[in-house]
Regions:
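Short acidic/glycine-enriched loop/turn segments that link adjacent beta-strands
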Residues: 37-41, 62-63, 103-107
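Core segments of cupin and vicinal oxygen chelate
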Residues: 9-52
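N-terminal beta-strand motif that seeds the catalytic metal site of vicinal oxygen chelate
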Residues: 1-19, 67-71, 123-140
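Vicinal oxygen chelate
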Residues: 12-16, 67-118, 123
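Short, charged/polar, Gly/Pro-enriched secondary-structure boundary elements
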Residues: 49-53, 116-119
Length: 140
């Protein structure tokens, strides 16, 4: 069996500045970077199984990224997921990360990186809210 592993790319103006943001404000680590003449042009940041690539290689794509990041919480309850996201919000705010509320038909915690790329963390849906649509899952 082969497992797939995705690493989305966020296009940024300055990889070194973005590394400082993701490491110092968002709590990621950086296992590697590609440099030329002492300047990083591509790097990876990781946090708890979430890996992102930062690159300055396509200027026309800078700041146009949007990534959904889900937290797998044990036990897998609505209350535990909400508590985990509230704890993440508190951690990020303590590190002066730009955290705001958002919505995608449900509540989001939104973080904008220095270039305007967005990280969306979804809160569990409220079973008491009335949705205008419904989720349809294809049969496997």
């Amino acid at each position: 069996m082969t497992n797939w592993f995705a690493r989305p790319v966020l296009h940024v103006t300055d990889v070194d500045a973005s590394l400082r943001f993701f490491v110092n404000r968002l709590g990621f680590t950086s296992p590697w970077r590609y440099q030329q003449d002492g300047k990083a042009h591509v790097a990876q940041v990781d946090r708890q199984g979430c890996a992102l690539i930062l690159a300055d290689t396509w200027p026309e794509k800078i700041g146009k990224g949007l990534i959904f990041i889900s937290l797998n919480v044990e036990p897998a309850t609505r209350e535990a997921a909400t508590a985990a996201l509230d704890a993440l919000r508190a951690e990020l705010q303590a590190n002066d990360a730009p955290v705001k509320e958002g919505s995608w038909g449900y509540r989001l915690l939104v973080v904008d990186d220095p270039d305007g790329n967005q990280l969306f963390f979804n809160y569990p849906s409220d079973p008491n809210e009335t949705a205008s649509g419904n989720m349809v899952r294809d049969e496997a």
